[in-house]
């Protein structure tokens, strides 16, 4: 199976070329006083690159996540093109829910331009499938960043956040 998944992953990765636009992206949201941003060598930072995105915090050292102050994230990522969030709730989060959770989120361009994509891990099997099928996640990320490469694709995990 591993060879099959690796082959699928590499086939998907080849859809993305260096000369196409690479939208800037940020990840997750603050938890308590900190925003735990994936580090530059984390699986998700690498997958963003493989999917053709420019991860704003790719220089963060390490492979885990780094706690950052909200102001630090806002300063560096206010103009990020896109924002991807994972959460676990009984219903999908909306822009209104995100604003109610923390009003300063609305300062980000990705919020203003309605370019937030969310993965509700309470409703989709992200954590159950991803370890065995990284190709599924990569396909979703390519769809988010470059939908023209996957016409007619119906994403498994990520959805465009609704108002």
Stretches with model-predicted labels:
Residues 22-42:
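Extracytoplasmic ligand-binding site segments that recognize negatively charged/polar headgroups
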Residues 68-79:
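Short helices/loops that flank or line small-molecule/ion binding pockets
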Residues 44-65, 84-87, 118:
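His/Asp/Glu-enriched short active-site or ligand-binding loop at hydrolase and phosphoryl-transfer sites
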Residues 85-163:
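Structured C-terminal subdomain patch of bacterial secreted/periplasmic proteins
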Residues 19-25, 51-54, 78-82, 112-115:
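Loop/turn elements at helix/coil->beta-strand transitions in domains of secreted/extracellular proteins
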Residues 1-4:
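Short, small-residue-biased leader/transition segments that mark boundaries at the very start
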Residues 6-25:
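Append "and occasionally in soluble cytosolic enzymes with long acidic Gly/Pro-rich linkers
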Residues 33-35, 56-61, 124-131:
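Active-site rim elements
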């Amino acid at each position: 199976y591993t060879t099959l998944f690796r082959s699928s992953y590499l086939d998907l990765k080849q859809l993305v070329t260096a000369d196409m636009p690479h939208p800037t992206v940020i990840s997750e949201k603050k938890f308590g006083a900190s925003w735990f941003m994936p580090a530059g060598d984390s699986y998700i930072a690498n997958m963003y690159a493989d999917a053709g995105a420019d991860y704003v915090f790719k220089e963060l050292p390490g492979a885990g996540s780094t706690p950052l102050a909200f102001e630090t994230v806002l300063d560096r990522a206010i103009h990020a093109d896109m924002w991807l969030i994972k959460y676990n709730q009984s219903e999908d989060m909306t822009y209104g829910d995100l604003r109610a959770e923390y009003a300063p989120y609305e300062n980000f361009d990705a919020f203003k331009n309605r370019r937030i994509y969310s993965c509700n891990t309470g409703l989709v099997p992200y954590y159950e499938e991803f370890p065995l099928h990284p190709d599924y996640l990569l396909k979703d990320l390519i769809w988010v960043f470059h939908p023209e490469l996957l016409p007619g694709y119906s994403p498994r995990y990520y959805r465009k956040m609704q108002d």
